[in-house]
Amino acid sequence: MSGRRRNHPGRLASIPGLRTRTGSRNQHPGIANYPADSSDFRPAQQRRALEQREQQAGQLDPARRSPSMPSANRYLPPLGQQQSEPQHNSAPPCGPYPGERIKVTRAAAQRSREMGYRMYWMVQRAATADGADKSGLTALTWPVVTNFAVDSAMAVALANTLFFAAASGESKSKVALYLLITIAPFAVIAPLIGPALDRLQHGRRVALATSFVLRTGLATLLIMNYDGATGSYPSMVLYPCALAMMVLSKSFSVLRSAVTPRVMPPSIDLVRVNSRLTVFGLLGGTIAGGAIAAGVEFVCAHLFKLPGALFVVAAITISGALLSMRIPRWVEVTAGEIPATLSYRLHRKPLRQSWPEEVKKVSGRLRQPLGRNIITSLWGNCTIKVMVGFLFLYPAFVAKEHQANGWVQLGMLGLIGTAAAIGNFAGNFTSARLQLGRPAVLVVRCTIAVTVLALAASVAGNLLMTTIATLITSGSSAIAKASLDASLQNDLPEESRASGFGRSESTLQLAWVLGGALGVMVYTDLWVGFTAVSALLILGLAQTVVSFRGDSLIPGLGGNRPVMIEQESMRRAAAVSPQ
């Protein structure tokens, strides 16, 4: 490099403390960023000396002094601005010391810590909004998020075994067998969960915690039977444990539904509460929990030949059990509550000779039958849940039938899963902002949309229409569920809402199980599977529409009942009172 180039003023002007040809050693370090040859932009010392000489000569008016002009570089101070001396205080400096250079890793750590703090307080504010921390809703939110995270981590843990290792025919037959073994007890127990909780004065929190503890044991059993060489599990252990985990997750949903009305803040309704819980579960559980499980699974599988996602499942379930016991104690109080019932019978005016029997019935426990709008919404939601359960299992076996490698199969399932997640999130986001004045009408429309999309998928029989049907079904399911919650809140007295919410959730889970069983047993051609599920959806849609019109295809379980029904024993008491 020549001496002329080394001493170029444009090169040295930006280096503090160096002398240039046109400036002194004490020039402003950013002199090159200012216009040249202008007295208004001279360094401060030169300008003050010039002003003093002009004042002494009487040539400068003090009022005409121009202020310091801004710099063209926004990171530099004005040229004439005096830099104040740093004030010494006892607080430690926040930034680096003069001359200290921040490393990339240190800057990234500081930035990550700052973003973590902001994210934590943002989530905390959202979780405690509307008085949720005082009502107990915040304490229930974290177990719900944990349950979503367990489902997501379990899906990551079993993705390799179910979609890479197992043969198609073998996996389908074994899943069908173990589905029968595990789902059949759930189908018997689920209708009894609500009445059992109505009779228990204590035990809701313990039941929620137990659903997590049992899943901890199942995850531990899978870890103990993991074969690191092949990356698989014995079939006699894998399928019962996987399906039992699914059943326990559904049981948690039923148990949670009986607790939610007891922790509802007075400033928001049940629809907003459930939408908030679902959004928290999707963001914090499904997305964040699934990402963490996928990262741990990748590291442990490649470095230690261990099922890392199952260790995440075990850790999350232990946390869920502890968080469930932190729910406030007042969710256990059931004094004054009246259980709800799905059935309803039209009772004619009793004859005089049957009056003693009616008096005996009046002396029994009070019950609250569900009204017409609730029954209509429940039938519509059950119809949609059949489709949701079908889409949960059926695409997996369809993907296995294609002669493609595991990554292609996983990509097909990822596309359908993404559509389901987007639809669910959009449906909950929309339902929280809808004015649900006529919820039964909205449920009927959602049921029609799902049935039409199922018929379209059966005609098209391709992946694109299946993805669209999944998207619409997930969104419609969220909106219909919010409409059902609105019907329960509007048409039931306060002392029966918790019981009615639990009974409805049990019924919805049974419908989901029916759809999942159909997805396992039907032939793995898209048009065949969607034709079979469309037949069920048409029957459910017919019952929904008939119930909406005040009639029923099934005696005692349709819409041939009033919109608002009095408590059963009170109505009978009025009917049999002596004239």
From Swiss-Prot:
Q: What membrane topology does this protein have?
A: Multi-pass membrane protein
One GO term of the cellular component aspect?
plasma membrane
SUPFAM superfamilies, A to Z: MFS general substrate transporter (SSF103473)
**InterPro entries attached here?**
MFS, MFS_trans_sf
Q: What is its main location?
A: membrane
UniProt keyword list = Cell membrane, Membrane, Transmembrane, Transmembrane helix
Q: Where are the transmembrane segments?
A: 148-168, 175-195, 206-226, 228-248, 279-299, 303-323, 378-398, 407-427, 448-468, 504-524, 526-546
Q: Where does the record place Polar residues bias?
A: 80-90
* GO MF annotations, alphabetized: transmembrane transporter activity
Q: What is this protein called?
A: Uncharacterized protein ML2143
